[in-house]
């Protein structure tokens, strides 16, 4: 089945998608650096590079898609807002598994300060899923993916199921409004692309989540 993976650190079976550079510490085997995602995207136009922004807010090869990771880099929401103000960024990806460094309101603050940019909030906050679904509901420039969260909290796979999180995923996927801004993300190689894909194919919104929503978002930032 054709699908795009909007949150992967390596290539598996996706027809294309966003490849996220991983820089800084700790280093993880089988993940791609900024230099590697740049090289892949130049050779294969099915993949778009998301360049990792470090705490020094240094230059990256292309500012169109940027990835911020507050938990690893310890920058504040105000610092990210300031950095985005002089970047030619069209799509901003901000890791949401950041307790205790950021709270959900910090993400809302960054989104509100950048109405001209699109955002992907990957992992949809983990334990804080309800707050991030609220951000999704009230901000038309926000997309989410459930990478990591979908498997870690037992929505798919064999781990124990945490109802508030798994039910939140189901609620979002069954919402005609919200499901239009959900992207498939796996977080490979940390979590299974295959397990998640199998579960998504059972939902009425599968074609949108696996293909259409991604294609529409990419068209908006071209």
List PLM regions with ranges.
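Mid-to-C-terminal alpha-helical segments outside catalytic/metal-binding sites
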Residues: 1-6, 171, 176-181, 191-222
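An N-terminally biased module of ancient metal coordination in phosphate/nucleic-acid-related enzymes
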Residues: 1-42
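Hydrophobic faces of well-ordered beta-strands that scaffold small-molecule active sites
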Residues: 3-8, 17-20, 48-51, 64-68, ...
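Conserved, mostly hydrophobic/aromatic
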Residues: 7, 37-41, 123, 144, ...
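Active-site beta-loop-alpha junctions enriched in small/polar residues
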Residues: 9, 22-25, 52-56, 69-71, ...
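Short, well-ordered alpha-helical microsegments
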Residues: 11, 34, 57-58, 103-104, ...
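Active-site gating/metal-coordination segments in enzymes
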Residues: 31-101, 140
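Catalytic pocket-lining loop regions of alpha/beta-barrel enzymes
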Residues: 75-183
């Amino acid at each position: 089945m054709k699908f795009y993976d909007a949150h992967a650190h390596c290539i598996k079976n996706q027809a294309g998608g966003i490849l996220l550079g991983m820089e800084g510490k700790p280093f993880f085997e089988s993940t791609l650096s900024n230099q590697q995602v740049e090289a892949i995207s130049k050779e294969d136009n099915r993949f778009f590079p998301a360049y990792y922004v470090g705490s020094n807010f240094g230059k990256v090869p292309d500012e169109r898609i940027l990835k911020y990771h507050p938990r690893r880099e310890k920058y504040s929401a105000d610092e990210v807002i300031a950095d985005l103000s002089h970047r030619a960024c069209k799509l901003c990806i901000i890791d949401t598994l950041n307790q205790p460094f950021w709270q959900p309101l910090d993400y809302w603050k960054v989104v509100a300060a950048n109405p001209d940019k699109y955002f992907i909030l990957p992992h949809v906050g983990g334990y804080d899923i309800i707050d991030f679904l609220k951000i999704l509901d009230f901000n038309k420039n926000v997309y989410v993916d459930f990478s990591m969260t979908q498997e870690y909290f037992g929505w798919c796979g064999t781990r124990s199921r945490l109802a508030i999180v798994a039910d939140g995923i189901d609620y979002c996927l069954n919402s005609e409004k919200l499901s239009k801004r959900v992207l498939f993300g796996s977080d490979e190689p940390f979590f299974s692309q295959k397990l998640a894909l199998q579960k998504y194919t059972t939902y009425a919104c599968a074609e949108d989540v696996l293909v259409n929503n991604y294609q529409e978002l990419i068209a908006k930032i071209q």
